[in-house]
Amino acid sequence: MSTSIIVTGAGGRMGSTICRMAQEDPVLTLAAVVERPERLASLDVWKCPSGSDPDAVFATVPGGVVVDFTSPEASMANARAAARAGVSHVIGTTGLTAEQKAELADLARTARIFWAPNMSIGVNVLLKILPQLVQQLGEQYDLEMVELHHNRKKDSPSGTALRLAECLAEARGWNLPDVANYHREGIIGERPKDEIGIQTIRGGDVVGVHTIYAMGPGERIEITHQAHSRENFAQGALRAAKWLPQQQPGTLYSMLDML
């Protein structure tokens, strides 16, 4: 049975990748696309209905799944529209505030919503194994992270970096906002033990690199995840689009639920 998907932000880099891969997938149908009015003409290549009003477009695809890599504000508007239309909603947008995440969780009580700041299978497997690593190493190991992305990325640190850092903090029994350090400069004194440094690099066309450091007496462990193309994230999002309609509303689903 084919799953009908609606791609929002279809004129963007992620959106166009998702459209192409959806059309190549035998069990998916690209049913509609959504974009800003000034970009609609560029969507003719997909040969499917298009529009700029999420409410109007979503209503034309009953039982469909919205796949959304846009902006925090657009994704929240899309989430409300998807809930009104009764369609499922897969969100890969990063940079959501705590308030926006709370609203998604509230909407998910009666709607099917899936949100992951990183749709990569590898990153989400990493989220599963990091707690065991951190707990077995013990608190004598300092935890740091460096993330690298292209020069057009708007949020910093990346949503993936923050989720990985949350995972590290939770494994230590810490609250990330209390221990995260995003900036070091000048005479800052010795490094506190209860700290996680998160550093950001931006440049070129780098899709995404995240390196976690665990540094202890006489040794250092480095774990790096490197995304080579956006197809990695698109594949995870389309896998979620096939999975989500089979689930019941009531919780904000994530990659860890699907895996």
UniProtKB/Swiss-Prot annotation:
Binding positions for NADP(+) per the UniProt entry: R36
Active-site residues, record numbering mapped to chain: H149, K153
Uppermost EC category: oxidoreductase
GO CC term, one of those recorded: cytoplasm
Subcellular location per the Swiss-Prot or TrEMBL entry: Cytoplasm
EC number(s) on file: 1.17.1.8
Amino-acid positions noted as binding NAD(+) in the UniProt annotation, renumbered to this chain: G9, A10, G11, G12, R13, M14, E35, G92, T93, T94, A116, P117, N118, M119
GO biological process, one term: lysine biosynthetic process via diaminopimelate
Top-rank taxon, per record: Bacteria
This protein's UniProt keywords: Amino-acid biosynthesis, Cytoplasm, Diaminopimelate biosynthesis, Lysine biosynthesis, NAD, NADP, Oxidoreductase
Pathway assigned to this chain's UniProt record: Amino-acid biosynthesis; L-lysine biosynthesis via DAP pathway; (S)-tetrahydrodipicolinate from L-aspartate: step 4/4
Positions bound to (S)-2,3,4,5-tetrahydrodipicolinate: H150, G159, T160
Reaction(s) this enzyme catalyzes, per UniProt: (S)-2,3,4,5-tetrahydrodipicolinate + NAD(+) + H2O = (2S,4S)-4-hydroxy-2,3,4,5-tetrahydrodipicolinate + NADH + H(+); (S)-2,3,4,5-tetrahydrodipicolinate + NADP(+) + H2O = (2S,4S)-4-hydroxy-2,3,4,5-tetrahydrodipicolinate + NADPH + H(+)
GO function term, MF aspect, one: NADP binding
Annotated Pfam families: DapB_C, DapB_N
Matches recorded under CDD domains: DHDPR_N
Family: Belongs to the DapB family.
Job of this protein: Catalyzes the conversion of 4-hydroxy-tetrahydrodipicolinate (HTPA) to tetrahydrodipicolinate.
Entries under PANTHER family matching the protein: 4-HYDROXY-TETRAHYDRODIPICOLINATE REDUCTASE 1, CHLOROPLASTIC-RELATED, DIHYDRODIPICOLINATE REDUCTASE
Name of the protein in its database record: 4-hydroxy-tetrahydrodipicolinate reductase
Species of provenance: Nitratidesulfovibrio vulgaris (strain DSM 19637 / Miyazaki F)
